């Protein structure tokens, strides 16, 4: 297979399924051959990223992720998509292990703030691990925006939604999701809310009320993935036609 990308997912699996669904649904295709070529690594058994970030005595996910990168190196995709937000804690080491570009989801989401002409405060919602590591905060601040991180009470609600409701129970609790967004917008006085966790992106995909000013990082990553894949396919076709 030529002109393909690879997806490093499985963290979690349902969120990865959501990402793949976005890729397929948003690709303008009228026949099978117009869809995108990709390989999915659904590595569901990677140790919990947040657990390790919060407590270094927990199992380190890094060796598992590096092994995945090494396997993808052998396949030689055009680029790699990392669909777990918290796994971007290890991004620099992963990118250093390959000459294949890895798309940076938090950076793409931060750039979307510029595209949407954001001027106010930006709330960042995600796992406790990604909050502690500053994965999104760093990218957003680098572009000059004021960031707002959830306080303890709000973070506990986010943790409960991500881990208990979605990951453990496979339950998309819309009422709790709206409550979290309402707090971020009204109580924390934020113009935009970044969904910096793929479980929150999964929640947003199926939410019935989407009037909140959300930047869905996974959705943005899906768009950038499609754009890059189509551009590289077009370039390959142009090169082939010149021969």
Swiss-Prot record:
Residues engaged in binding substrate: 48-50, 85-87, 167
Reactions the enzyme catalyzes: L-aspartate = D-aspartate
InterPro entries, per the entry: Asp/Glu/hydantoin_racemase, Asp/Glu_race, Asp/Glu_racemase_AS_1, Asp/Glu_racemase_AS_2, Asp_race
Keyword Cell wall biogenesis/degradation attributed: yes
Molecular function GO terms recorded: aspartate racemase activity
EC number: 5.1.1.13
Keyword set, alphabetical order: Cell shape, Cell wall biogenesis/degradation, Isomerase, Peptidoglycan synthesis
Residues forming the catalytic site: 84, 197
Protein's UniProt keywords contain Isomerase: yes
Pathway: Cell wall biogenesis; peptidoglycan biosynthesis
Gene Ontology terms describing biological process: cell wall organization; peptidoglycan biosynthetic process; regulation of cell shape
Family named by the database record: Belongs to the aspartate/glutamate racemases family.
Function recorded in the entry: Aspartate racemase that provides the D-aspartate required by the D-aspartate ligase to be added onto the lysine residue in the peptidoglycan precursor UDP-MurNAc-pentapeptide.
Subunit structure: Homodimer.
Protein's UniProt name: Aspartate racemase
Source organism (scientific name): Enterococcus faecium (strain Aus0004)
Lineage: Bacteria, Bacillati, Bacillota, Bacilli, Lactobacillales
């Amino acid at each position: 297979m030529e002109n393909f990308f690879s997806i490093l997912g499985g963290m979690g699996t349902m969120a990865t399924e959501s990402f793949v669904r976005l890729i397929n649904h948003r690709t303008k295709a009228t026949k099978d051959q117009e869809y995108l070529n990709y390989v999915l690594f659904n590595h569901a058994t990677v140790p919990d990223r947040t657990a390790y970030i919060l407590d270094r005595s927990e199992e380190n996910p890094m060796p598992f992720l590096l092994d995945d990168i090494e396997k993808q190196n052998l396949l030689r995709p055009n680029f790699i998509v990392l669909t777990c937000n918290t796994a971007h804690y290890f991004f620099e080491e992963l990118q250093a292990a390959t000459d294949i570009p890895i798309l940076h989801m938090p950076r793409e989401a931060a750039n979307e703030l510029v595209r949407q002409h954001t001027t106010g405060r930006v709330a960042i919602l995600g796992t406790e691990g990604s909050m502690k590591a500053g994965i999104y905060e760093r990218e957003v601040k680098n572009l000059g925006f004021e960031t707002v991180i959830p306080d303890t009470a709000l973070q506990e609600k986010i943790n409960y939604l991500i881990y208990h409701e979605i990951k453990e129970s496979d339950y998309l609790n819309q009422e709790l999701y709206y409550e979290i967004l309402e707090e971020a917008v009204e109580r924390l006085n934020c113009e935009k809310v970044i969904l910096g966790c793929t479980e929150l992106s999964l929640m947003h995909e199926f939410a019935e009320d989407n009037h909140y000013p959300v930047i869905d990082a996974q959705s943005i990553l899906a768009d950038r993935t499609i754009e890059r894949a189509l551009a590289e396919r077009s370039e390959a076709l142009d090169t082939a036609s010149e021969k």
